[in-house]
Amino acid sequence: MEIIWHGHACFSINGRKNVLIDPFLAGNPLSKIKPEDIDADIILLTHGHFDHAGDAVNIAQRLKIPVLAAFELTELLKKDVKTIDINQGGTVDFDDIKIKAVNAIHSSSYNGMYAGNPLGFIVTDERMYYHAGDTQYFSDMELISKYDKPEIVMLPIGGHYTMDVNEALIALDILRPKIAIPMHYNTFPVIKADPQDLKKEASKLGIEVIIPEIEEKIDL
């Protein structure tokens, strides 16, 4: 399985399917590619904020692929693209993979309109991975750790709108994955963080932290 971090909370995960999560490229000051450079089979949106959903419609229209998101967000998008709605606790079978929606503690709007609950996603592909979305740590992570057991987790570390490094360490202590990948940091000054701090402290928990460069391909 290949993982590419496009910056911020945007990832391409290429396994049995090519999954694109939270596309934010055109407005991302750190982005190294354009939305038209992206390929995918499906887009997952954790919530509707511009820095997570900004390029979803353009990419979905060009590739003629569906966007999976919370019900209220899909209601706002379905006039423009094919959508798949979901909510917390729900699982969608998309060809050879399973996509489960779980809780995230944040907010969600799209172009100023209410967009439902924010989500995290647990995807069962060649390996199981958990993209936490924008969130703080929360008690449901204990259930995710016990029953879902994701091997790979992507967690925000930038603070201000989400967890910071110290809170992400608490989340990792709960989740106990094999591998963690930090996200949602250094895109803007208000979310400045050093992922090396996470790597150093997580090693004491026996968790490997991989810090990819933007557009670096990681085989896991």
From Swiss-Prot:
GO molecular function: hydrolase activity
Alphabetically ordered keywords of this record: Hydrolase
Alphabetized InterPro entries for the sequence: EF_Hand_1_Ca_BS (IPR018247), Metallo-B-lactamas (IPR001279), RibonucZ/Hydroxyglut_hydro (IPR036866), UPF0173 (IPR022877), UPF0173_UPF0282_UlaG_hydrolase (IPR050114)
Entry annotated with the keyword 4Fe-4S: no
Gene3D superfamilies: Ribonuclease Z/Hydroxyacylglutathione hydrolase-like
PANTHER family: UPF0173 METAL-DEPENDENT HYDROLASE MJ1163, UPF0173 METAL-DEPENDENT HYDROLASE MJ1163-RELATED
NCBIfam families: PRK00685.1 (NF001911)
Family membership: Belongs to the UPF0173 family.
Protein name: UPF0173 metal-dependent hydrolase PTO1118
Organism: Picrophilus torridus (strain ATCC 700027 / DSM 9790 / JCM 10055 / NBRC 100828 / KAW 2/3)
